[in-house]
C-alpha cells in the first residue's frame, strides 16, 4: 500500500495542431493544483476536482481558443485520463467503487464511479428544464460532457453523473466536478484487505 502511495509523479506531454498540453500528476497527493487551460472557469473546475479528489495536478494547455474551447477542454480530458490510467492500473488494493451526492445551493448532483478498466459515461441533465447549453464565463456548457467523456474513456473508468436538481449553470457544473472528485477519491481509497477488487482476479 505504501508503495502505491509513493508512486512517482506521472508526466505526459501531448501536442497536436490544435493543442499543446503538459501534465504532472500524483494520484495519491494532497489536492494541490496548478492549472492553466486558457479558459478561466474551466481552470476553476479543474482546481475543484483536484481539491476534492486529493490528486496533485499541474496542467498547462495552449490551445486554439480563438476558435472556441472545444479542443482545449476535450484534450485536457484526454491527457488527465491518460495520467490517471497510468497511476491507477493495475488496480490492486483499492475500494474500486465510489459515489457522492454533492449540493451547491439549489443544485444537487450525484456521481458514481467504477474503477473497472472499462470505459463508460452516463451524463444525465434531464432535471435541468432547459437545454443544457449556454456559457459560464468562457466555457461552453456543452463541453462539460465532452470533458468527462474524454476523461473516462482515457482513464478506463465508468462514471454516472446525474443532475438531481438545479437551475444555476455555474452551481450545477461546479457540483458535477466536486462530485466526480469526491467519488474518485473514495474509489481510490486504499484497503489492505482487498487484493484485487474483482472476481476476475485482475483489473
From Swiss-Prot:
Pathway: Amino-acid biosynthesis; L-histidine biosynthesis; L-histidine from 5-phospho-alpha-D-ribose 1-diphosphate: step 6/9
CDD domains to which the protein is assigned, alphabetical: IGPD
Keyword annotations of the record: Amino-acid biosynthesis, Cytoplasm, Histidine biosynthesis, Lyase
Reactions accelerated catalytically: D-erythro-1-(imidazol-4-yl)glycerol 3-phosphate = 3-(imidazol-4-yl)-2-oxopropyl phosphate + H2O
Gene Ontology CC terms, in alphabetical order: cytoplasm
Pfam families in alphabetical order: IGPD
Disulfide bonds: none
Gene Ontology biological-process entries: L-histidine biosynthetic process
Entry keyword annotation includes Lipid metabolism: no
Localization per Swiss-Prot or TrEMBL: Cytoplasm
Enzyme Commission number(s) of this protein: 4.2.1.19
One Gene Ontology molecular-function label: imidazoleglycerol-phosphate dehydratase activity
Keyword Electron transport applies: no
Predominant location category: cytoplasm
Domain of life: Bacteria
EC primary class: lyase
Family according to the record: Belongs to the imidazoleglycerol-phosphate dehydratase family.
Official protein name in the record: Imidazoleglycerol-phosphate dehydratase
Organism: Helicobacter hepaticus (strain ATCC 51449 / 3B1)
Organism ancestry: Bacteria, Pseudomonadati, Campylobacterota, Epsilonproteobacteria, Campylobacterales
Gene encoding the protein: hisB
